[in-house]
Amino acid sequence: MSSYNPVLIRVNTDSGLSGIGEVGLAYGAGAKAGVGIIRDLAPLVVGEDPLNIEKFWEFFFRKTFWGMGGGNVFYAGMSAIDIALWDIKGKYLGVPVYQLLGGKTNEKLRTYASQLQFGWGDKRQILVTPEEYAEAARAALDVDMMRLKWIHSKSIVMAMTVFFRIKIVTIQDCYWPIN
């Protein structure tokens, strides 16, 4: 199992402002693909107005070969640039990015432990047994992560067979009716 290798980008402007974004491909071979897509997309941003964020999205999405069907790597690159541009716009206007996106909606946010099928904390491995899933759940709960996200319904069942103190969060490829 590969370790966590985040790919961060910085977009610099002529005025001296800069914004930071993250390519969301931090595990496995994805990090190298993330670097590659940024190298391909970066020249398309140079010389343009960084405050015109929608123009970049429209260009990347509608006028590049991979925009409308690019998959994870392409969209991770687009997203990293988008995040960096929002960072620049917030700095330029002197407001937090959440204000640009509609304002604060919560005083506190619930967090959840994600991707537990790969373990928790510094221990990275593909989990196989119900006991391994339960151990990952316990480790997350030990640091007050009271919500756990599992990518496969099988992993939920495996953890629940050993450990019952969890709230279930699923993603769109799972169907679990929860009352």
Task: Locate predicted features.
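Generic secondary-structure boundary/loop-capping signal
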Residues: 5, 17, 42, 57, ...
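Metal-dependent enolase-superfamily TIM-barrel catalytic cores that perform enediolate-based chemistry
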Residues: 108, 112-179
